[in-house]
Amino acid sequence: MRIDVITLFPEIFAAITDSGITSRAKKRGLWSIERWNPRDVTEDNHRTVDDRPFGGGPGMVMMAEPLKRTLDLIRTSGNRGRVISFAPNGTRLTDEKVREWVASGGDLVMVCGRYEGIDQRFLDHYVDETVSIGDFVLSGGELPAMVLIDAIVRQIPGAIKELSHLDESFSTGLLDAPHYTRPEVWEDVRVPEVLLRGNHANINKWTREQSLDLTVKTRPDLIEKARAEGKLTKSDEKWLRENTQPLKK
């Protein structure tokens, strides 16, 4: 997968190109990234990419023309993929959406806004989808872009061990269960005994019940979604009836 990023701060992306799973996957050729600074296509001495908003108000707005010129260069270089921008008013990013993008096998272009935002005319004519990573405001689109890239790369076959995907939050429709490692006792707290016995059937049962319990307590909406998608077993439903308040079906 090829990902092109339009950003005023290309150096920020070293965090994902030089470290961790994303770096290793990049070195193995599973994905590639190109960073494009719209200042490089400006024609004035100040390399201007922003201006005051019409109608007044605080801050500056990123101009449409430098972004359009940068996108034209990306298209000419061979990336014809979907264009994504980032803003709190966008569609909430979900694991399901990430998996859809990976399954499509298509390239992506990510536009990272700054200041008060991007001229709406560019968004209307050239951006296919605006994504939000939560109900809060950041200084720019670079951090959301890196969040999305990390989530995407993890789903590319070969990026991480296959079994890791199976146990991650959302892969089964539920949140992940708690994890423990050595020592067995830390600050007088023991690892749950079931994890020390080596009985894999019991461990699997405990893990599933922990996932159910955590999901019910923190994301009950996911229980309803998993039920609607047929991801809850009869054993799951029995545990829910016995251990939680009645849930709507």
Question: Model regions: which residues?
Answer:
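Short, surface-exposed acidic-centric catalytic microdomains
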Residues: 35-56
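S-adenosyl-L-methionine/SAH cofactor-binding core of RNA-modifying enzymes
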Residues: 63-114, 120, 157
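Structured adenosyl-cofactor binding patch, chiefly the S-adenosyl-L-methionine
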Residues: 118, 122-169
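Short, structured active-site "lid" loops
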Residues: 49-70
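Hydrophobic/aromatic beta-strand patches that form the interior of the parallel beta-sheet core
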Residues: 4-6, 34-36, 82-84, 108-109, ...
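SAM-dependent methyltransferases
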Residues: 1, 183-249
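Glycine-rich, flexible N-terminal cofactor/catalytic loop recognition
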Residues: 1-40
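Internal, active-site/partner-interface "lid" segment
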Residues: 143, 155-194
